[in-house]
Amino acid sequence: MNRESDWLWVEPIMGSRRVSNFCWAAILLFGALGFFFVGISSYFGKDLIPFLSSQQILFVPQGVVMCFYGIAGLFLSFYLWCTIFWNVGSGYNKFDKKKKIVSLFRWGFPGENRRICINFFMKDIQGIRMEVQEGIYPRRTLYMKIKGQQDIPLTRIRENLTLGEIEEKAAELARFLRVSIEGL
C-alpha cells in the first residue's frame, strides 16, 4: 500500500494492463489469423501464407469451420485488446482521515458508467476481513466490512499474495483506519 501521510492513504489498483493479458491477446490474435487464412486459402485453392499449408483441407466443411473459428478468435482478441487499451479495472482506493471519507475508484468500459466511484464515511467501516482458502488454487482476499452493505473486496481475485503479505496489508490498513481484523 502506498501511504502518503498520516491522514491520507492512496492505494493504486492495477487494471487489465498486465503482461499475461498482453500475451493472451497476442497469442489469440495470431492463432485466429492463422485459422482464418488457412480457411480462406482452402477456398481459393492456393496458400495465401506460404508456411500455412491448406492443400489437403476441403473448403466445405473444414475450411468453413476454420474461418468460423478464426473470426470468433478475432472477436475475442479484439475484446481483450480493447480492455487493455481502456485499462478496465484500474483505479485506486483512497482513505482520507481529514474528510473522513473512503473513495474506491475504478475505470470501466466506455459508456455512461465508465467511471465507477464508491464513496462512504469512515464511521461506517466495521472492520477488515481476510478470506483465505488454501488448496490447488489458493485464494487470499481482503474485504472491508461496511454497515448495512455487503463486504467490499480491496484486493483483486487473481492477486497472488502470500499469507504473510495479506496479513501485513490487513494489519497496516486496520491500524490506519483504527478498526479490527476478522478472518483467518
UniProtKB/Swiss-Prot annotation:
Q: Per its UniProt record, what Pfam families does this chain match?
A: Ycf4
Origin: domain of life: Eukaryota
Keyword Nuclease annotated: no
Question: InterPro entries of this UniProt entry?
Answer: PSI_Ycf4_assembly
For this chain's UniProt record, which GO biological process terms are given? Answer: photosynthesis
Q: Where in the cell is it found?
A: Plastid, Chloroplast thylakoid membrane
Listed transmembrane segments: 21-43, 68-90
Q: Which keywords annotate this record?
A: Chloroplast, Membrane, Photosynthesis, Plastid, Thylakoid, Transmembrane, Transmembrane helix
What function is annotated for this protein? Answer: Seems to be required for the assembly of the photosystem I complex.
UniProt family annotation:
Belongs to the Ycf4 family.
Its name, as the record gives it, is Photosystem I assembly protein Ycf4
Organism of derivation: Physcomitrium patens
Task: Tell me the lineage of the source organism.
Answer: Eukaryota, Viridiplantae, Streptophyta, Embryophyta, Bryophyta
State the gene name recorded for this protein.
Answer: ycf4
